[in-house]
Design a protein with these regions (language model features):
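Residue-level detection of beta-strand-connecting loop/turn positions
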Residues: 1, 327, 530-532
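Intrinsically disordered, low-complexity N-terminal segments that are enriched in acidic
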Residues: 2-192
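Long, compositionally biased intrinsically disordered regions
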Residues: 34, 38-41, 349-472, 483
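Short, solvent-exposed coil/turn linker segments
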Residues: 83, 103-106, 120, 130, ...
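Secondary-structure boundary elements
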Residues: 117-284
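Extracytoplasmic
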Residues: 429-587
Length: 587
């Protein structure tokens, strides 16, 4: 097929269009009523756009809602009378839509690059299942249908037909569509390798590193989970870091903040401090930032754990994010009192996005495909053109089929229920997060101190006897077993009492060190006060990038030692400090 030119694809499109136009017609009276309702709706929108006072705006909004309801009512008898699956037009509708959206020039250019590319295009245009999946799941970025087919074929070629096959097939489709048009890593010109991105999420899922719901997302949802601009190495770091440094964030009952709550605790609201080029998400966590960087980090953390994310803007200086939760999509970092109706992302409004989210969640994929996607295909067949990068989000009397698809989507969206967003099913893999939650035992007693044969004493950091409020100091179980302590800010302090059965070797001083994890370049020293010393010791805390690391040992006096109190100095740059263990080693 590599010798086929633009004319071939134009002729093929004409032929497929002809087939489509032999399909269902519209009752003239119903058609006129719907067009009239669409026109009235447009007039109401235009009135709102030019309204000046708040009163005029509110009146125009009410008129728009009333007009839209009339559109819905006039569309219902038309929609009830149409079943595009019965008319034997499915193949022609799919081909037409793909040829229109991919463009004759685009297909010809790709197909003529090599014999393989020609074969890929031929396979795509003759494979109903793949065409359906492409269109059902939003089409490829940049309308690069040929490249999406190439990527999908390459990824599918290496798939094993094991218990992960169904999920991996969806991930492969999501990656192929999302990275059909090349994307680059954060603050670099390095192109993201689609196959490596697929491999990253496939392996992370297989190892149970992702959110428990990841197994059950749709391909359309996967696209918003795997499309991070972070490198695969940074995504892996994000999961490892949070599981070590702040494991409690992976189990928050308020799913809106699960994984991304670390923005509130650790991404300081301040001018960002980038310490190297290119910038990285590790630098962002350490150096802080305002609206933009904080939203970036929240999206990054959610996607690292496989959670679908949609970014948004409310005005040039306000950038936020929305994310999937089992109760529906929710917003983070938005302006107070605002909602999806006040935001947008690129050319898409939040209202438009949420309508599609709700419609897809309310019904099965097959119903959404048959009732919405095929209507959009018919609109392409009827030459109801879309402007470049246009998001068709309002009825248009001159684009009847596209308007019917929009109304149908609204009707489906209105059916959404609270439980429509639950993502559960038969276990393919037990996630580490599920295991962690199952093992949480808030009634478990503190772990005992341990004295080794060489005289070394190990004190579990969570086995303190006294601390101040939980908002400053908290303890929780670790992913790798045992417990850990988290000093949230510079106001926290903890005290340890040496049990009577723990004795020190007489006449010998000891070296004290701690196993800690930190995520900030600048650290406040840890202060140690003991009952047997007149002045406090200072322990330098390293920047560990979220990994467990031992501090440099300091020498302390242990004669008559019975209590140790650890604290830090309150400061604007004093953030979290995770402590796993305190070690006292004889010199």
């Amino acid at each position: 097929m590599s010798n086929f030119d633009t004319s071939f694809f134009k002729d093929l499109l004409k032929e497929e269009r002809r087939e489509c136009l032999e399909g269902p017609g519209l009752d003239l009276g119903l058609h006129e009523a719907f067009v009239e309702a669409c026109q009235a709706s447009q007039y109401a929108k235009e009135a709102k756009d030019i309204a000046e006072s708040e009163e005029e705006v509110e009146m125009a909004k009410a008129s728009m809602e009333e007009a839209l309801e009339k559109c819905v009512e006039s569309a219902k008898p038309i929609l009830d009378s149409i079943d595009l699956m019965e008319s034997d037009l499915e193949m022609s509708l799919l081909r037409t839509a793909i040829l229109v959206r991919g463009g004759s020039k685009g297909f010809a250019k790709f197909a003529n690059q090599s014999d393989l590319h020609g074969q890929l295009v031929e396979t795509l245009l003759n494979n109903k299942k793949i065409m359906k999946e492409f269109l059902l799941n939003g089409g490829p970025t940049g309308k690069k249908y040929g490249n999406a087919m190439k990527l999908y074929t390459q990824m599918m070629a290496g798939l094993e037909k094991d218990r992960f096959y169904k999920v991996n097939k969806k991930i492969a489709m999501a990656v192929a569509l999302e990275f059909a048009s090349p994307q680059t890593e954060f603050d670099t010109a390095v192109e993201i390798d689609a196959e490596k991105r697929f491999s990253h999420y496939e392996k992370a899922h297989r190892k149970g590193e992702l959110d428990p719901a990841f197994t059950y997302f749709s391909t359309w949802e996967y696209r918003m989970a795997i499309n991070s601009d972070a490198s695969n190495e940074q995504l892996q770091w994000a999961r490892n870091m949070q599981m070590v440094y702040a494991p409690h964030i992976t189990t928050l009952y308020d799913e809106r903040w699960r994984y991304n709550y670390q923005v509130s605790t650790d991404v300081g609201y301040r001018a960002p401090n980038w310490t190297a080029s290119p910038r990285t998400y590790q630098q962002l966590l350490s150096g802080g930032g305002r609206e933009g960087p904080r939203a970036w980090f929240g999206r990054f953390m959610c996607r690292a754990f496989g959670i679908p994310v949609w970014g948004f803007k409310q005005h040039p200086k306000n950038v936020g994010m929305s994310r999937w939760t089992p109760k529906g999509w929710e917003m983070n970092f938005q302006k107070p009192g605002s909602d999806f109706g006040t935001c947008h992302w690129d050319d898409r409004s939040g209202t438009h996005f949420m309508e599609e989210v709700n419609a897809r969640a309310a019904v099965s994929e097959s119903e959404f495909y048959e009732k919405v996607i095929l209507l959009e295909c018919l609109a392409d067949a009827c030459k109801e053109k879309m402007k470049k990068d246009e998001e068709f989000d309002f009825v248009d009397p001159e684009r009847v089929w596209r308007s019917l698809a929009l109304v149908q989507r609204k009707i489906l969206a209105d059916k959404v229920q609270t439980d429509s967003f639950q993502r559960t099913g038969p276990n393919v893999v037990i996630s580490k997060i599920d295991k962690y939650i199952q093992n949480i035992n808030e009634q478990a007693p503190p772990l005992p101190y341990d004295k080794l044969d060489n005289g070394t004493i190990k004190i579990p950091a969570a086995s303190f006897t006294e601390s101040n409020e939980k908002k400053h100091v908290r303890s929780h179980q670790s992913f790798d077993g045992g417990n850990q302590l988290h000093m949230v800010d510079g106001k926290g302090h903890v005290t340890y009492e040496i049990p009577e059965d723990i004795s020190f070797q007489e006449g010998i001083d000891y070296m004290l060190s701690l196993i800690v994890a930190t995520v900030h370049l600048t650290q406040q020293n840890l202060q140690l006060e003991t009952n047997n010393a007149t002045s406090a010791y200072e322990i330098e805390i390293p920047y560990t990038l979220g990994e467990w690391q031992e501090t440099e040992p300091i020498e302390i006096e242990v004669g008559a030692l019975s209590t140790m109190k650890f604290s830090r100095t309150k400061a604007s740059d004093c953030f979290g400090l995770a402590i796993k263990e305190i070690i006292l080693t004889p010199c």
